[in-house]
Curated annotation (Swiss-Prot):
InterPro entries: ATG101. It is found in: Cytoplasm; Preautophagosomal structure. Interacts with ATG13. Associates with a complex composed of ATG13, ULK1 and RB1CC1; the association with this complex requires the presence of ATG13. Pfam families: ATG101. This is Autophagy-related protein 101. Residues 152-156 are annotated as: Important for interaction with ATG13. One of its GO terms (biological process) is autophagosome assembly. GO terms for molecular function: identical protein binding; protein-containing complex binding. GO terms for cellular component: Atg1/ULK1 kinase complex; phagophore assembly site. Transmembrane segments: none annotated. The gene is Atg101. Its main location: cytoplasm.
């Protein structure tokens, strides 16, 4: 199975990390979730509806759409909060990345554990920039909103391509493809990881600083 890999890069102020990451992760999971399956008999099932809601960011001029699931939101906020704290405590330049990996399980014979086979991975590289003035922060608020909008549009375009998705499972195999542990939504199986890095490249950060500098010069 070929695993599709997508990489995004963002440059944000420290207080924008959480909102930017939640916007990206929620957007991806919005397109990788279904309503709960309700099986009538093997081979016959109905799919529940998925509620959605708008989220207005406090530190970015941006509004994104997420699945209306408090359980899913709490799970994402927990790991994003850990990532934000790790960035803040790194003592470096605020470089890091988060990865959202979708996978399906392949049953193995006893005594071996099930094999997890990834089929799509989203990686978001993050560079936190330090700003000196409130004027710079206001400009960054607007510019990050514009850049984040571009990233979200890119995600939607990628999701619209007719590429691999796991086939709909039978009732006995649904847990090999979907996370059935949530009460109100059923995302494809996924896991999120993050790391703090020493070197990430400066192209995105340089672009953001240039945008702020050019705007101040107007």
């Amino acid at each position: 199975m070929n695993c599709r890999s997508e990489v995004l890069e963002v440059s944000v102020e420290g207080r924008q990390v959480e909102e930017a990451m939640l916007a990206v992760l929620h957007t991806v999971l919005l397109h990788r979730s279904t309503g709960k399956f309700h099986y009538k008999k093997e081979g016959t099932y109905s799919i529940g509806t998925v509620g959605i809601q708008d989220v207005d960011c406090d530190f970015i001029d941006f509004t994104y759409v997420r699945v209306s699931s408090e359980e899913l939101d709490r799970a994402l906020r927990k790991v994003v909060g850990e990532f934000k704290d790790a960035l803040r405590n790194s003592g470096g330049d605020g470089l890091g990345q988060m990865s959202l990996e979708f996978y399906q399980k392949k049953k193995s014979r006893w005594p071996f554990s099930d094999e997890c086979i990834p089929w799509e991975v989203w990686t978001v590289k993050v560079h936190v920039v330090a700003l000196a003035t409130e004027q710079e922060r206001q400009i960054c608020r607007e510019k990050v909103g514009e850049k984040l909008c571009e990233k979200i549009i890119n995600i939607v375009e990628v999701m619209s391509r007719h590429e691999y998705l796991p086939k709909m499972p039978t009732q006995s195999e649904v847990d090999n493809v979907f996370d059935t542990g949530l009460r109100d939504v059923q995302p494809y199986l996924y896991k999120i990881s993050f790391q703090i890095t020493e070197a990430l490249g400066t192209s995105v950060t340089t672009t953001m600083r240039r945008l702020i500098k050019d705007t101040l010069a107007l």
